[in-house]
Design a protein with these regions (language model features):
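Conserved short alpha-helical segments that host acidic/polar catalytic motifs at enzyme active sites
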Residues: 1-235
Length: 235
C-alpha cells in the first residue's frame, strides 16, 4: 500500500538503493478522466508527463517531470513548471563549486507558487546532487498555497527512499499535504524499471470504478556516480 494513502496525487521519493546508489521515483495519479489521459515519455535527458495521442498540450497537466545530467550526476524531479529551473540551479551550483543549499529549493518553489487549480495543489520537488567530496546530497521541498515553501535535506539509509506527496491521501476528499508529512518506502531491487514498477504496484487504488494510476518513473544512478538509468511504467 502507498504510505501516503490511496490518493497521494503526485508523489516523489529520493534515497538510495541497497548498494548506496542514489535513486529517485515519481508517481502520477488522477481521479478525473482528464487527469488520467496522459503518459510519461522520454525526451532528451528527461521524462515529460504529456498528452496521449493528438490531445492538445495543457501547461497545467503536461510538464517535464524528470531532468538529469550524465556529466554531473544531478537529477531533478517535480510535479510541474519548476523542474527545469531547479535542475539548472543546482547544476550551476555544482559547476561553480558552490554548496547545494536548501534555500535555493525554497526560493524556486515560492516562485512557482501552488498550482492554479481548485485545490491549490502544492508544488513538490526533489533533487539528488553532489556536495563536498562528491558525496550525494538529497533535498525535498513542498510549497502550499497559504505558507512559504519548506525544503529538507534527507539522509536516507541504504534501501530506503523518503518522499512527499501533493495530497494527504483521502480519495473522497483530497487535502493539500503538509511539508512535514514525509513518508518512506523500502526498495530491494537494482534497476530503474524495478523501482518504477514497485511504486506503481503499491499505489493501486480505484475511484468511481477506474484505476487512478497514470504512470510511475524510476531513476537509479550507476556506480560510475554520474550516469542515470531511468525507466517508466504507464497505465
Amino acid at each position: 500500500m502507498n504510505p501516503n494513502g490511496p490518493y497521494p496525487g503526485r508523489q516523489l521519493f529520493i534515497g538510495m538503493t541497497l548498494n548506496s546508489s542514489p535513486a529517485v521515483a515519481y508517481l502520477v495519479t488522477g481521479r478525473s478522466p482528464a487527469s488520467r489521459e496522459r503518459k510519461a515519455s522520454p525526451l532528451d535527458n528527461g521524462i515529460i508527463i504529456g498528452p496521449i495521442g493528438n490531445q492538445p498540450y495543457d501547461p497545467l497537466r503536461h510538464y517535464t517531470g524528470v531532468k538529469y545530467d550524465n556529466a554531473s550526476g544531478i537529477i531533478a524531479v517535480s510535479n510541474g513548471i519548476q523542474t527545469e529551473a531547479i535542475f539548472e540551479t543546482y547544476k550551476l551550483l555544482f559547476n561553480t563549486g558552490s554548496l547545494p543549499a536548501i534555500d535555493f529549493m525554497e526560493e524556486l518553489l515560492d516562485g512557482a507558487r501552488a498550482e492554479p487549480d481548485s485545490l491549490h495543489t502544492p508544488r513538490i520537488a526533489g533533487i539528488a546532487t553532489n556536495g563536498m567530496n562528491n558525496q550525494p546530497v538529497f533535498i525535498l521541498g513542498l510549497k502550499r498555497q497559504e505558507m512559504p515553501a519548506k525544503a529538507f535535506q534527507v539522509e536516507p539509509a541504504p534501501g530506503t527512499l523518503t518522499g512527499i506527496s501533493t495530497y494527504k491521501g483521502n480519495l473522497e476528499n483530497p487535502e493539500p499535504n503538509d511539508p512535514d508529512n514525509l513518508s518512506k518506502i523500502e526498495f530491494k531491487g537494482k534497476t530503474a524499471i524495478e523501482l518504477a514498477e514497485h511504486l506503481f504496484e503499491i499505489s493501486k487504488a480505484v475511484y468511481n470504478g477506474d484505476d487512478i494510476r497514470v504512470c510511475a518513473i524510476g531513476g537509479i544512478r550507476s556506480e560510475d556516480k554520474h550516469t542515470w538509468q531511468v525507466a517508466m511504467r504507464n497505465r
